[in-house]
């Protein structure tokens, strides 16, 4: 975890102090459950719940000998207690404490992620509504296609982000599960009721079945969902980067007073935040492979997953949280240039209206093949003009004039019918209906 890419609230969940505090929370829940079952007296339960404490430095000192951080933790806590310490960590195994504590930490962390996703969705929705009718050129393969609106672009992003909210709700069900089932998961030394009570105290569900650990397909699902979320965020960031290119310049990241873009070129205003998001998304996705490989543990458990999770889980949550907040800020403060969008629309010389013309000809009796051939032939002439450097002066009249001078078209379409094809409103007439689908 790098401080540079971490928000305080999420970072606070993934440090040694919080980890052992959560271990202690789980252990106290187990003690309370034993007490509820009549196995630990009220006085001992009360003493443990009130007095149990730990010291990080002492845990580290003990671990030098034990080579086992959970035993170092339980030993340290026992030192803070009296005779009642014999009931601390009673009848359970290390993974009962560790995995159940991890469920608590992941649940809290995922709630922060869900909050970030909701914020991003709302920001995209608001900016989409703001630019519902802002005309721009749509691009496929990076090449001009047909007129669209910038609002449609943002609405598409918003709808995709909303899907992640549904996926994360399901993932929350998978990860908010505890297990207090003993060394082999067979409840030999602790009844099922102990697990149900302890997990209930902690606000967790119980796994239907476990061995020594909670099964890692749950963790892998989480990693994959965060990777998918990152890919969607990267898609947004990459599109912003393209739209900010000097020759496009339809949007721009906010550039604050005193900000610098280059140590060598004073004129530079770069999409550095979107580039940063792109890089963070690569980091997030990089954890999917080791988390998937953690699913296949030996028999009732081996420890190969542990080192992976010590790296992956904190970084997955912290980086995803930061990515969301940064992207939300980029969208919220994004500067949009509608005039440049209109200028770029005109740069096609009117080619963006080619399909409209194509679809009018068959209505007049011409075959689709002949229609396509005539329209494409005229379009290729415009490309030849544009190849000669006429982009800077291009407007809709280039293609329109070519069509108006084509004797073959005149047999099927009169001048007013041809001119009617060059109408931006034709391409935006359903935007309102689309928005109603997306946003209700």
From Swiss-Prot:
- Residues of the active site are 141 (proton donor/acceptor), 262 (proton donor/acceptor)
Q: Which domain of life is it from?
A: Bacteria
Task: Look up the EC number in the record and give it.
Answer: 4.3.2.2
User: Which reaction is recorded as catalysed by this protein?
Assistant: N(6)-(1,2-dicarboxyethyl)-AMP = fumarate + AMP; (2S)-2-[5-amino-1-(5-phospho-beta-D-ribosyl)imidazole-4-carboxamido]succinate = 5-amino-1-(5-phospho-beta-D-ribosyl)imidazole-4-carboxamide + fumarate
Residues noted as binding N(6)-(1,2-dicarboxyethyl)-AMP in the record, renumbered to the chain: 4-5, 67-69, 93-94, 212, 263, 268-270, 276, 307-311
Output the SUPFAM superfamilies linked to this UniProt entry. Answer: L-aspartase-like (SSF48557)
Explain the purpose of this protein: Catalyzes two reactions in de novo purine nucleotide biosynthesis. Catalyzes the breakdown of 5-aminoimidazole- (N-succinylocarboxamide) ribotide (SAICAR or 2-[5-amino-1-(5-phospho-beta-D-ribosyl)imidazole-4-carboxamido]succinate) to 5-aminoimidazole-4-carboxamide ribotide (AICAR or 5-amino-1-(5-phospho-beta-D-ribosyl)imidazole-4-carboxamide) and fumarate, and of adenylosuccinate (ADS or N(6)-(1,2-dicarboxyethyl)-AMP) to adenosine monophosphate (AMP) and fumarate.
Similarity comment: family membership: Belongs to the lyase 1 family. Adenylosuccinate lyase subfamily.
Listed under subunit, the entry gives:
Homotetramer. Residues from neighboring subunits contribute catalytic and substrate-binding residues to each active site.
Q: What is this protein called?
A: Adenylosuccinate lyase
Species lineage, top-down? Bacteria, Pseudomonadati, Campylobacterota, Epsilonproteobacteria, Campylobacterales
Gene this chain is encoded by: purB
